Regions:
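Feature captures hydrophobic
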Residues: 1-95
Length: 95
């Protein structure tokens, strides 16, 4: 398990304070996946309502608040596969 992914999951848990109402997966290219749901964030690769894929730099910028997820999507740095409504709820929860 990557230390970087574990730290990212911890950062997301602090930022989101208890998860969100839905299930989402961040697929960080070449590194692995982080699941987010009502139980919070964890390093795992499970079924989700939406999968968001980005490189490590983009993902880091999103979780640190330096890059808005919507901006990342519109610029092609973040791809979304699945329920767009869930992706929007997650973006709001991360704000």
């Amino acid at each position: 398990m990557s230390e970087t992914l574990t730290q990212a999951a911890e950062t997301l848990n602090e930022k989101m304070d208890g998860g969100f109402d839905g299930s989402a997966k961040f697929d960080i290219t070449g590194m692995g996946t982080i699941m987010l749901d009502q139980n919070g964030a964890r390093v795992a690769n499970e079924e989700a309502e939406v999968t968001m894929t980005a490189d490590a730099e983009t993902f880091q910028s999103i979780i640190e608040g330096d890059l808005n997820p919507t901006t990342a999507f519109m610029s092609g740095k973040l791809t979304i596969d699945g329920d767009m409504g869930t992706a929007m709820k997650l973006a709001s929860a991360m704000a």
